[in-house]
């Protein structure tokens, strides 16, 4: 997963705030869907410096490193087909829709970006932060 944005304004968390990731729950751990990083409940992770990069001045700013997550996640259910769901990731209003069909093994995990962490957020509600903590809370898709 690569964070991208026209603007890359670094922010520092004034307080803890919640974010969400898609992945797998394995025992007491959460494994992210894209990078397969394993998070332990309520354990601090290594702080990762965030470096926005633009190949050319007119390119989107991109950040590969850091902890990638979403500001919001909403799930649309269809009673006539319980194996089909629309997952609204990022910003429910301006974010994007990801369709997960028959992915009953996936979970939405709740995480905290701790106070003092650096982070960037784009217009799609995607967040990349220098630190993240898994709360141990999840919802099965």
Regions found by a protein language model. Name each.
Residues 1-65, 73-141:
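Conserved NAD+-utilizing ADP-ribose enzyme module
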